[in-house]
Amino acid sequence: MLVVKKGEGVKVRVRVNGVWYEKYVSPRTLLVDFIRDELGLTGTKVGCDTTTCGACTVIMNGKSVKSCTVLAAQADGAEITTIEGLSSDSKLHPIQEAFKDNFALQCGFCTAGMIMQTYFFLKEHPNPTEEEVRDGIHGNICRCTGYQNIVKAVLDASKRLRS
Ligand code: FES
Ligand code: FES
């Protein structure tokens, strides 16, 4: 069991987007706050802070997680990918391209989480049906788009990733 004296931080060492970071934080620090405030990776958003909306979704040790549900201390030693880790050499990832080309965002607040969930989902389901897409992103809420173009974008992204 982790014992922390009053006023002491816990050491969190994580590899995020290929870079190792080591920080001392309060044991109550949420992973999403660690990512945004300690690492400055503000692409990951906080929508509800209660595991409902999915705006904070990142990949942790190969699985998508809602990072407002995980303590930073629980992520110690983990490999994490955030939205900033998807593009390379200033080139958008095919999923990001598909979201852009299918007008799958409006305000964009849900988009990083939606794309990270899509990234995970398409690894598990490289050639999904529309129904599987809808099921795969059901934990991510979008207040703007009505989901239609998001579903189209995920199906388009699956084609791009297969070609
Ligand atoms: S901010 Fe994490 S699920 Fe909404
Ligand atoms: S684009 Fe605005 S919440 Fe999804």
UniProtKB/Swiss-Prot annotation:
All copies of domain 2Fe-2S ferredoxin-type, residue ranges: 10-86
Subcellular location(s) per record: Cytoplasm
Gene that specifies this protein: cutC
Keywords attached to this entry: 2Fe-2S, Cytoplasm, Iron, Iron-sulfur, Metal-binding, Oxidoreductase
Cofactor(s) named in the record: [2Fe-2S] cluster
Cofactor-binding details, from the entry: Binds 2 [2Fe-2S] cluster per subunit.
Organism this protein belongs to: Sulfolobus acidocaldarius (strain ATCC 33909 / DSM 639 / JCM 8929 / NBRC 15157 / NCIMB 11770)
Annotated GO CC locations: cytoplasm
Protein name as it appears in the record: Glyceraldehyde dehydrogenase small chain
pH dependence: Optimum pH is 6.7. At pH 6.7, glyceraldehyde is the predominant substrate, however at pH 7.5 the dehydrogenase exhibits activity preferentially towards the aliphatic aldehydes such as formaldehyde, acetaldehyde and propionaldehyde.
